[in-house]
Structures are given as C-alpha cells and as structure tokens.
Amino acid sequence: MIQTTIQTIAKALDTSLSGCNDSDISISGISIDSRTVQPGNLYIPIIGERVDGHTFLDSAKTNGAVASFWQIDHKPYPDFPVILVKDTTVALQDLARAYMQSLSCTVIGVTGSNGKTSCKDMLYSVFSQKYKTQKTQGNHNNEIGLPLTVLDLDADVEIAILEMGMEHKGDINFLCSIASPDISIITSIGSAHMENFGSKENIARGKLEILTHTKSLCLYHTCPEIDAVLSEIPHGEVTLHSFGPHGDSYIIGDIIHHKDGITFTCNDMENPVSMNVLGDFQAENALPVIYAAKTKQIDENAIEYGLEHIEMTKMRTQQITIGQATIIDDSYKSNPESAKVALDTLSSIPTPCHIAVLSDMLDLGENEESLHAQIGTYAHQLGIDYVFCVGDLSFYTADAAQGTWFDSKQSLIQALRPFLDTDCAILVKGSRATAMDQIITDLQQGENE
C-alpha cells in the first residue's frame, strides 16, 4: 500500500495543509470508510448521494487515522491534520494516478462485458508463480474502486492486475488514465448496460477506448461490431491479438468436461491444460492469460500449475457442494450472453440431473421481456431437466422453458431441498440486485441444521 507523507501528497496534488505543525506526518494506506480505518491511514471522506464522509472524521480518528483529505468548501476546517482539496473524489483519483506513475510494475488491464473477474483470477494464479502480483479485490473496478486498488499496491509489486468496469461512454478512457495498462485484455463484448449504450457497436466502442492507452491488446473476437470500431481507432503501434470464434492468434482444440473442471488443448501450449473451473467459456478466458504469461516469460509448467489451482472470486461460477449436489454459484450478475454461457456450463457437467435456478436480468431496455423468454427457450433446447425461476421478468423465462415460476424465494428453496440428496448440478444465477446468493445461503443453513 502507499507509504508516504502528507507533505508529499500535498505537493503531488498542488495543494496545502491545515491543522498540523508537522508536515512530515507519515501515512500508511488509505480508507474511504471510517469504520475500516487502520492505524496510520489517510482518511478520504467521499461525498455520496446520501452520506457525506466528512461527518465521520471523529470515527476515523478514533480508529487511527493520522490525517484526512478535506474539501475546501467544508468550513471551518478541523483541528486535525488535513490536506485541502477542491473535491475529495477527484483528489483520490489524482493521488492514485500519481502513485501509479511512481511504480515500476507491469500493469495488466482487464475489461469485458462478461468474464473479466474470472480472467483476473486466472491471471493472478498464473503470474503469482513467478512475480510479486496483486489484483483488484472484489468489485473495485470503477471510478472509486480502481483508485483504491492502485493505492493498495505495494511499492515493490511486479505485476498489477487491474479490472476495469464500464457503465457509460468514457469510463474505460478515464480508468486507463489512472491505470496506464501495458497489457490489456477484453474478455467479451456483450449486451450488458445496453440501456446506457443503445447498441452493441457502442458497447464495443466503449470497451475499445482501452486501445489508445496500451501497448498490447488481446481481445475476444466474436462479432462484426469489433471490426467496424477497430477501423475507427488508430492503433498502429499497438500489438493486437485476438481469440474466440473470429480470432486469429489463439485457438482452443478439444475440451473434456469433468465434474470439477475441464481439460483443453491450445495451439500455443505443448500439453493439454487442466483447470479447476467449469465451462467452455473458462477455457476461452484462459487464452489471453496464456498470451500475457508468455509475454512475461512465464514457462508452460508454471502456466499449467496456475490454471489448475485458481481461487475464483465468490459468486462467479463458484463451485459449492451441498449434500450430494453440486451448486454453481453464478449469482453476481446476469445478462443474456452470460446466462446462455452459464446454461451451457450447467449442461456440460457429467451428472444425471441438471437444474437451472434463474432470476431477473436487469438494465436490458425495452426488449427485456423477449430477452428473458429467449433464455427460457435456450434452456429448453439444451434439455435442462428443471428450470426454476423467481422474479417478475423471469416469469417469461419460466414460461418459455416450460419450467416453474415461484412467487417467492422461500417457495423456490422448498422445491429445491429434495434435490440436495441426489447427484445433480444446480446453477443459481441472476442480476446482483436480485440477491440470488441468499438461496444458496439458506440451502447451506438448512443442510447444517
């Protein structure tokens, strides 16, 4: 994490101090939450829609903060060491940008409509075999989270893996202005946040903002929109590699499915690669990892070991055993592309019974009802044995799948419980706001009672 003095920070931000006699006060790390402040931290009071972090300075001091940012329009200034700034959020971002420029690590930037968190976890598992590596924790991938991730990097980090999310035009451009990625990966371009972008081509245009900030880009090439947007953006000095159905650099051969993972072949690896995660799409996510690893001279044995020992982030195709059943917790988010991929993964698991537990996909715009119905039709075509749905929009999914719609999670949970004593695979998926992970928690608690 960042280790410096308040005077150095004030100088980097071209501002002044207040409330202190000693400008050499050392800080160790930062926090934007007064409840999580650690001794030696710099407290950064963010002003949100409902809460102003300035009101929690006393709590931050009690927990050990030694200094704080302070917005100049908040007078009087406290009798406490503060760094005066015009906007605490902008100052957080500017501090992260300055700190990133002081580091000598290789930065790998990862974005994509789907798969970026899985790819990030794979990169970390592989690169940790050779280098001191740090990665984005949780979902810290936006205009607040990415600066927090950067400021949590150690001075001697060798590889920084930074996940970058996107909700609006310009988001990737802004995050790259802080991260300055050396190697960039676009895992997919789908319909997530279609409501904000209007078209898949605009989503591609937003993701490809990364192209003007990087030295090397590896992208998942699945749609003609990519070609159209690539032709708009000058990228003559960028090394460009692609993978996927229309890719030209990395090609997957045979994929063998196991109950607890997959094995696949790749044109750039001498031996088959085994992974402790499920789904053909995870083999595709591994391709840019292989590319990036070879760029940094990681040998194939280390790549193979890293991909076989991945620690996945919770709620992203996380495998959980409850009773005799295998639960696939993919409850962090859902959109049409990721839902179809998740159903493909479910159907590929070698088990006698497959159950899809689905809830609403949000932010899809005016076609939301038909898109939910398409997921139900797809589940039916795959031959999923049971499709259980909850949520207003998921009524259309259940209807098209010839499945069952429940008016509450509790009634759905009661229908699921008997299956826990059988050899079956159960997929749980929905947009984050639907909190489908509660179903898994309740099933686990019931099993332990």
Across the structure, where does each feature detected by a protein language model lie?
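Acidic, Mg2+-coordinating active-site environments of NTP-dependent enzymes
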Residues: 13, 73-78, 185-327, 351-352, ...
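ATP-dependent carboxylate/acyl-activation modules
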Residues: 110, 314-316, 433-439
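Phosphate-binding loop of NTP-binding sites
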Residues: 10-13, 91-217, 221, 227-237, ...
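N-terminal leader/targeting and accessory segments in enzymes
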Residues: 1-94, 278, 349-351, 377-392, ...
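Residue-level signal for inorganic ion chemistry
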Residues: 9, 41, 60, 95, ...
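Active-site beta-alpha connecting loops in nucleotide-dependent enzymes
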Residues: 50-51, 313, 331, 335-405, ...
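Peripheral docking tails and interdomain loops at the edges
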Residues: 405, 423-444
